[in-house]
């Protein structure tokens, strides 16, 4: 990780774009790690950017949320590029000749999943036919040995698919809580399916590593994202229940959420199982350090989602219908970061997502370890002297126009109060006819060390292009950008703003 540190220290004021790979253009119904991802890196370079921030890269479940994945370690198979598989001889031109008609504006995850699964099974069949001395075979074998999480994940997914995707708590006991001897039987029962899941993960990791190397060669750093909590329906909880506060069956006894606030009278009940921090402490946070180790292979900088949960978190009884009955419970605090530093060295490249209910104790934890927090410009214009206004921002922070959880800037301005809109116009000295570019200029001109904009703001897109609306169960995460939007004119305009403000 020393190379990352030297690059970060050398580049004082950095800017970049937030876009999840699923949102990239491409003919297979979803953005992936193929040619369009490389084209996007080229766009970043042409426009003078040095950061590409993504959402978590894991395999998603029913609501397609990257924050509710089947594993904290695995990658999203839907991001695998069929074109790159063709380049390796695992797919043919004929395989890719009859692509269904997919929307270029939003992802139909079910249709894309069905189509890509068909392609991946063809690629897997060809892979198995390769001679044993083929380098790809030895690469997969090496990957399987080095990825400590892979056996459990592959078995979990093989069983899950055989059960029609049912939650693991609904499986028969021999699958739900297998003994060592039962696992050996399951390995034989699902031998081919387990190898297929390993093949997918190896392919994802190879394609991602190649893309990351391409970006890094161009002085572009990747910012990844670690959701603090994991999904209850995950290989993590299934394989390692002792890491979590769950009963002997596997049901959580307490769950995650946040207390009532201005936006929600009953708080938010997320439902994720909570960690057994006493057990983690006994193991010197080994599982967490492995999680960071995996993430640092995928990313140069890591954002910790809901950072405040490491200081203290809202614990809600599992049978509650709202978050009202919760209470604050201490997290691992300083000790967690002391172990992190001992493992990865001083000044680990981490961003603390410090939005929401943030106390002095949370700020003290963030500042003690020198972690940059987040400042969202859309939050800056309702109050007279908001901490989010650029003149109140410290150097050691990340300034965003908005994030994946916010409306686009154009959409936000259209629905903001007249008081906020008036302040925007006066603060930015603008008529707000292209308000997202006013926000981009203000963001890039801020004192913040890092300035990041969601890709939708580059194109002045409205609320219909929003990535996620918190609290809304369906219809999220589907946004895609059209190929023709990434023009040299947009790159030149962004480059000029970037250089004007010394980024």
Where are these predicted regions, by residue range?
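Alpha-amylase-like alpha-glycosidases and glucanotransferases acting on alpha-linked glucans and related
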Residues: 5-11, 20, 64-205, 230-452, ...
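Catalytic domains of carbohydrate-active enzymes, especially glycoside hydrolases
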Residues: 10, 35-60, 298-299
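N-terminal catalytic cores of NTP/NDP-binding nucleotidyl/phosphoryl-transfer enzymes
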Residues: 16-41
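Conserved, well-ordered alpha-helix/loop/beta-strand core segments that scaffold catalytic motifs
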Residues: 197-230
